[in-house]
Amino acid sequence: MTSDRSRLRTAWDEFVGPEATAVDNSLTLGAGLAGLVVAPSLTPAARALPRGEAVLLRILAADLWGGVVANNTRACARWYERSGQTDAHHLRFAAAHLHPLLVAVLDRRAPGAPVRRGVAAVARYGYLMLATA
């Protein structure tokens, strides 16, 4: 029987790469925490967001900041470029990114027609998928 701690460790290893060092993990988690705490305070507009959108912004920032660090570790590069990884694996990984949609939700009150914002979200997502292919 696998413990919850063991399952969590396995999931983390499959996310950032099983060769991640303590420094890699600390930097990744630290950057994510910094994004969660610091990023929303970098612009006055973020302070005026409704609570739900502020939480969404914090989660998005934590994911982006932590992800940038994780993706730039040797462990992550080796894991995602290991033997057996196919273009389909990379496309599925990219498809799971919901950032373009979340940005469109956060931008919904920005000036401009809603259709243009929807088109922009689709264009960003399409670019992400094309860049991955």
Residue ranges and their predicted role:
Residues 1-133:
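Short amphipathic, positively biased membrane-proximal segments
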